[in-house]
Curated annotation (Swiss-Prot):
Name of the molecule in the record: Large ribosomal subunit protein bL19
HAMAP family per the UniProt record, alphabetical: Ribosomal_bL19
Top-level taxon: Bacteria
Recorded family membership: Belongs to the bacterial ribosomal protein bL19 family.
Pfam families according to UniProt: Ribosomal_L19 (PF01245)
Length: 115
C-alpha cells in the first residue's frame, strides 16, 4: 500500500523546481483569483526556511514591504505556485534564518555566495 502512495505522490511532484537554499533571494510567481479574474502575482524575498517532505515540501519567504516584514509559506509542488526563480545566492551557515525577524536595515543583509 505504501508503494502505491509513494508512486502517486511522485507523479504529482513538479520536476522543474530549481535548487535553492536558505539565504537565497527568490521570486515566486503565484496564481491569484480575484472575482472571476485569474492573474499571476510575484512575491520576492529571502528564503528563511525549507521543509523537505516530498510532495508536502514547503519553504518560507520573507520580505520587507512598506517597512513591515511579510512572511509567506509556499508549498513547493502546489499548482498555485507557477514558477520559482532564484535571483541571488546567499551565503549563510544555518538552515533556519528566523533570527532575521528581529533584524532590520544593514544587520539583516546576507552576503552573496560566490560559487
Amino acid at each position: 500500500m505504501s508503494n502505491i502512495i509513494k508512486q502517486l505522490e511522485q507523479e504529482q511532484m513538479k520536476q522543474d523546481v530549481p535548487s535553492f537554499r536558505p539565504g537565497d533571494t527568490v521570486e515566486v510567481k503565484v496564481w491569484v483569483v480575484e472575482g472571476s479574474k485569474k492573474r499571476l502575482q510575484a512575491f520576492e524575498g529571502v528564503v528563511i526556511a525549507i521543509r523537505n517532505r516530498g510532495l508536502h515540501s514547503a519553504f518560507t519567504v520573507r520580505k520587507i514591504s512598506n517597512g513591515e516584514g511579510v512572511e509567506r509559506v509556499f508549498q513547493t509542488h502546489s499548482p498555485v505556485v507557477d514558477s520559482i526563480a532564484v535571483k541571488r545566492r546567499g551565503a549563510v551557515r544555518k538552515a533556519k534564518l528566523y533570527y532575521l525577524r528581529e533584524r532590520t536595515g544593514k544587520s539583516a543583509r546576507i552576503k552573496e555566495r560566490l560559487n
